[in-house]
């Protein structure tokens, strides 16, 4: 393998997909809820979401946060959502492509055409989204590596999670750029030697531009995302 081979390593939820916070209107429509029923906004309005704030203080895990939200939506709809994947499948399963970030797809395409390797490093890809959702996403076939803690049981920011991904890529950490929306995971990646971008869900294009810049690639244009 060329010594200058590079890789783009992405978290999935929130980074490749739009967050559930951004798609409340779609969720409400899909689940038959009145518009405005879902009011939790996470990073888009932290003061109004105490549960999100508790997660940011490490008082609960991200899985805990979504487990609680899933139960709340189950109660609202009367549906038996026992797992996060049940909720996501009902809310998004009809059209998974509609919740993909166009910036993500453009950056993935740019990295692929520049012969960069592609990897997903997720704590909960199939746990939260379900394998059926994943299998509908054609662009994932372009990925060289998918590491999902649903199966490995090793959650970021555990150093072993990053090393497992690097081992599967066959690359040193310095050759990889990692993108994640959780600061704890960014700190873990940096401790493992990866160059990292803390993804900002408020400015997704800027975050992907930062990642492409670290890879030495051209920045996104508006035409890339159409």
Regions found by a protein language model. Name each.
Residues 1-10, 121, 125-226:
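Asp-based, Mg2+/Mn2+-dependent phosphohydrolase catalytic module
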Residues 1-47, 191, 203-206:
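Active-site neighborhood of HAD-like aspartate-dependent phosphohydrolases
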Residues 22-26, 50, 64, 68, ...:
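Alpha-helical elements of Rossmann-like donor-binding domains used by nucleotide-donor carbohydrate transfer enzymes
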Residues 31-44, 74-90, 217-225:
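Short, surface-exposed acidic
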Residues 50-54, 128-130:
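A short acidic, helix-capping loop that chelates divalent metal ions and anchors anionic groups
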Residues 52-88:
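A metal-dependent, Asp-based hydrolase signature
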